Amino acid sequence: MSSPLNNRGTCSRSSSARSRHSARVVAQTPVDAQLHAEFESSQRNFDYSSSVSAAIRPSVSTSTVSTYHQTMQRGLYIQPFGCLLAVHPDTFTLLAYSENAPEMLDLTPHAVPTIDQRDALAVGADVRTLFRSQSSVALHKAATFGEVNLLNPILVHARTSGKPFYAILHRIDVGLVIDLEPVNPVDVPVTAAGALKSYKLAAKAISRLQSLPSGNLSLLCDVLVREVSELTGYDRVMAYKFHEDEHGEVISECRRSDLEPYLGLHYPATDIPQASRFLFMKNKVRMICDCSATLVKIIQDDSLAQPLSLCGSTLRASHGCHAQYMANMGSVASLVMSVTISNDEEEDVDTGSDQQPKGRKLWGLVVCHHTSPRFVPFPLRYACEFLLQVFGIQLNKEVELAAQAKERHILRTQTLLWDMLLRDAPVGIFTQSPNVMDLVKCDGVALYYQNQLLLLGSTPSESEIKSIATWLQENHDGSTGLSTDSLVEAGYPGAAALREVVCGMAAIKISSKDFIFWFRSHTTKEIKWGGAKHEPVDADDNGRKMHPRSSFKAFLEVVKWRSVPWEDVEMDAIHSLQLILRGSLQDEDANRNNVRSIVKAPPDDTKKIQGLLELRTVTNEMVRLIETATAPVLAVDIAGNINGWNNKAAELTGLPVMEAIGRPLIDLVVVDSIEVVKRILDSALQGIEEQNLEIKLKAFHEQECNGPIILMVNSCCSRDLSEKVIGVCFVGQDLTTQKMIMDKYTRIQGDYVAIVKNPSELIPPIFMINDLGSCLEWNKAMQKITGIQREDVIDKLLIGEVFTLHDYGCRVKDHATLTKLSILMNAVISGQDPEKLLFGFFDTDGKYIESLLTVNKRINAEGKITGAICFLHVASPELQHALQVQKMSEQAATNSFKELTYIHQELRNPLNGMQFTCNLLEPSELTEEQRKLLSSNILCQDQLKKILHDTDLESIEQCYMEMNTVEFNLEEALNTVLMQGIPLGKEKRISIERDWPVEISRMYLYGDNLRLQQVLADYLACALQFTQPAEGPIVLQVIPKKENIGSGMQIAHLEFRIVHPAPGVPEALIQEMFRHNPEVSREGLGLYICQKLVKTMSGTVQYLREADTSSFIILIEFPVAQLSSKRSKPSTSKF
């Protein structure tokens, strides 16, 4: 993949990454569909090696892709280890069921069944009658629960036999799916309220993961696969990582000793299709018990418009090609778990709040294989999923640390290169150390400057580099450079001759004729897999058979013309160097003598004075903030003597500031805190900062009678201008009152009633849970801080019903918070030492509460752990008030959403009436012009109906939503867009003109015409809004370009321009179009959603400002439909 280095203000690192990812997904999906179709048609004769050539084959029909998606997401079969019921969520009437359900639920006895038994499992029957009363109540209650998956599994019993099942529920578009898995009689059943118990299965594994040192991703993955292997007992457990180009790699493995190793194996992107990756995001754990088992068909209500969606079903059947792949590698059963991390590329702008939920992206998979059939009960699978969530949190930290380390390295190298450039540009960055090769990972670099070459490392020859420079000037003269991981795909004619030396290249212009090149060799040089060394002859039919060894061959074939991709952070570094060079050298065209010119840096003295003035301002402001802070803050020098002591510290200890300054800190702490303080000081001198450490300060004067002051502190190193550590600052949180209550609780050995019922204002917020995770107590302080009354939480699940991800209960900001809370509760209930957690949630008024949560185990008279007692230490009222102000806008957004929901519902009926009226008019005898107007009217209604169904904005934002593919006439769609803009244009007395060639009227395409209409109409309305009558017309311009792909297939590359008079749309609104934030305006949200829809259609949006005009530029491509004699003549209506 190649990309020009253009300087565009709207481009960012994250948008670049998203564009590349979207392009790969779009490119891979038709290939996946084609391979699937070929497998289905050939079955056992399928040639796996064709996956290599599939990527360069001609196009795939949209019907093939649609059929493929339907098969992947809406298959008609399940695995036989359980049965499936689909019901209406309100009435529990049956919508669909699997053919094995009657047998599993004991509705088909050997005797002649009764009428009730025959009718109990029929479409339209009430499913609750199939289970005993207590089970029916549990299912009914679960159906009313927002996040129903948090209640899984629900233990139910069949009415006739009492046979126990785990009911695993999830919602789909038409109702509620209930997967029923029989409970093994020898297992102790886990009830819904006891879902917390399944976490205990993974408690030790979680502890081991959390105890690992940071900075070692390989060790983290090795421990994970080992723990999963011990938990599940599979013969082989592997950790897969997806690389940026979508191919996968086995980065860790735990296997049975006699099995072939797969560690280091790379496989092409087509091995795990994009549709499967989408399913892994929907269903985090996927089990196949026996890939050779006979599948079970689903019977569904004939009135359902399409087959049942099985994306979230635990029973979804395996696809034929996957089952054959497993069989070929000697695997009968498998368990696959997705590894997701925070998608920081979703938002590249700091919104000023960390409380907005971030999206997730698929980082990789943990894959388990077994050589015989294997069933893992749901509670154990749930424990594995929980373990993977913990791993995801740890992994997120590792990914962030690695990215930060890489950026720090680049910044250090850039600083040194800049210093060299001041003395000798640009030759110095090649002849001195470090040099330009140290900036980014590469195999060689070249400087082409004033018709001379300077080479480092492995590079093409001088003549070849000059040829590349000439090619860049002739073919990419409008850009400032080029980056590509494949010179072949970039179109360089001499790429084949360079393959053994160079495949990838990043090139920048430093003047009109001078370049710097970075080169990378092909990926295969960096690939090491032990399995490649001892390949048996014809073990896999020379790569034709689906097998990991064939996957490796296919991967090597795919990447033989490709290098490791250039990362965004690397391209940022290269681009920054380019800007420095272009600023320090005069362009050759402007300097006929070809003399280098170095821009003089400001005098050192001036810079130092300027820096000191800025530092003084910042220092004064920091001192003021520390002195007035509502938290205790103290500081010491390198000798450990106090040199900072704010008003809050003086208030708590009774020791005035002037008495504290200059005294050793160890003289002010109690005896059992001296070692802790010494350790903190020693670590700080080495540059290591500590968090959440407890120290006890002595009390003085009037506070002496209150005993020691207990602080939870974070340490941070104070440094001078040369980065030398000169002291330590402690920021603390007063836990004295809370600690006193907990000590009292410990002394009275669990007599919590005296504490929880105590009305004293000094009693902190307290709640309690039993060993099943249900809430037992919720004291007055907890009611006050959350706004939730005691009776509303008693007997409810703490995680899922009290603390939730939704608008009921106490909402937390993200799934990671619930995961951390679950870890803490599980650890304490399992008997581990008490822990603390920084914990935040929203109260019933939408105010965000930040607190420190401390959890202690509850023990009964026999010494058995019966649950946990939890104390919240909440931030000061001043901080709460500030957070409340910050969240007022969020509350307003919630109210707006409710109003929008009402309007959304009320619009449906009149819209249905309008559509009915139009349908009555269609058979009427109308003129050609009237028929065109009617057609545009119907398209407008279809577009409105489509928008009204857009309730899942998250799927739109993540570009995961499903697009329709229909044949449509482009001019009809464009005329419909113009019709939507004309009323506002007439109102503002602004004319709307169209500018497109006559061929548009005859152009029929495949794609989602309604989404295209929505996008263009919104951008047109925005242009109208910011245009004044006297400024000129608005023009909808279309520039088509057809490209032949293979024989008989064409792609239409379309450039839509909505040209309007300058100054155009305000810059702030354009920024909102590309960067969504909580304070987004109504117009900005509409533009943002349209931009996401365009990305989902594999297109891009730009906004161009010129001297007299501004333009929305939308670039999209659609397959051209084949000619059909049934089509109506092209539209020629004018506006």
Curated annotation (Swiss-Prot):
Residues 1-11 have a biased composition (Polar residues). The keyword Flavoprotein does not apply. Keywords: Chromophore, Photoreceptor protein, Receptor, Repeat, Sensory transduction, Transcription, Transcription regulation. Residues 1-26 are annotated as: Disordered. The keyword Repeat applies. GO terms for biological process: detection of visible light; red, far-red light phototransduction; regulation of DNA-templated transcription. Phytochromobilin binds at residue 321. Contains one covalently linked phytochromobilin chromophore. Belongs to the phytochrome family. Homodimer. This is Phytochrome C. It comes from Sorghum bicolor (Sorghum).
